[in-house]
């Protein structure tokens, strides 16, 4: 009985101590500091479990068609994904070094995720990270599946292919100028005499 009472007292002290630590402002939320190992571990476990549970969207049958892969590279570039995650032949932008946790190198992450999980993350974002949700800002499901198709091929995409797929389209040719209207004769020019019958 005394043992149970002691355990109960210690549990209460632990709860109050944790509450004081977190709600008393002692836990630093600065992006320049790493989370304690136990906090980092807990966040990773919660994040992974949440993604696995919520990623239920069925992938389109032809989502990894080569044309979709190329369109996905264009969408990846247009939405600024390379700024934080890099791209074949491209570097991360300087500001991404200030994001915590660090944006992952997608070549390492993609093999660990199913297409449905990648789709869910891109569409919904991840709370308490720098990963935004692209669904609410105009990316359609088709756009996102194309990005997923590109990501699944990313480990084998060359710099030359990426540059070719993301190259801006050539501007359309300017319209041809309208044909010039015939110049009317001057007002004081003599009229052409009518032809006379012979």
Language model: regions and residue ranges:
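Short, flexible segments with low predicted structural confidence
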Residues: 43-44, 93-95, 119
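Periplasmic/extracellular electron-transfer cofactor-ligation site
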Residues: 74-100, 124-128, 132-133, 155-160
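Extracytoplasmic electron-transfer domains, predominantly the class I c-type cytochrome c fold
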Residues: 98-154, 198
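Sequence context surrounding c-type heme c attachment/ligation sites in exported
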Residues: 70-82, 112-117, 126, 138-141, ...
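Short glycine- and Lys/Arg-enriched binding-loop motifs that mark or flank ligand-binding interfaces
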Residues: 68, 89, 121
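Short, well-ordered turn and helix-capping elements at secondary-structure junctions
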Residues: 88-91, 110, 135, 193
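Periplasmic c-type cytochrome electron-transfer domains
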Residues: 2-74, 135-150, 167-189, 193
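Polar/charged alpha-helical tracts
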Residues: 67, 103, 160-168
């Amino acid at each position: 009985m005394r043992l149970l009472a002691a355990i109960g007292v210690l549990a209460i002290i632990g709860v109050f101590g944790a509450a004081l630590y977190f709600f008393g402002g002692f836990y630093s939320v600065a992006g320049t500091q790493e989370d304690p190992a136990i906090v980092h571990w807990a966040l990773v476990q919660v994040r992974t479990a949440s993604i696995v549970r919520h990623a239920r969207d069925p992938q389109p049958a032809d989502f990894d068609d080569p044309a979709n892969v190329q369109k996905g590279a264009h969408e990846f570039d247009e939405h600024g994904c390379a700024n934080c995650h890099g791209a074949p032949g491209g570097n991360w932008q300087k500001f991404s070094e200030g994001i915590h946790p660090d944006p992952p190198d997608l070549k390492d992450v993609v093999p660990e995720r199913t297409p449905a999980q990648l789709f869910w993350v891109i569409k919904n974002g991840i709370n308490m990270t720098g990963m935004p949700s692209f669904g609410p800002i105009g990316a359609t499901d088709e756009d996102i599946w194309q990005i997923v198709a590109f990501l699944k091929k990313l480990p084998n995409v060359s710099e030359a292919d990426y540059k070719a797929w993301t190259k801006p389209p050539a501007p359309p040719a300017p319209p041809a100028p309208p044909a010039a209207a015939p110049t009317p004769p001057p007002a004081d020019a003599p009229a052409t005499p009518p032809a006379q019958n012979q």
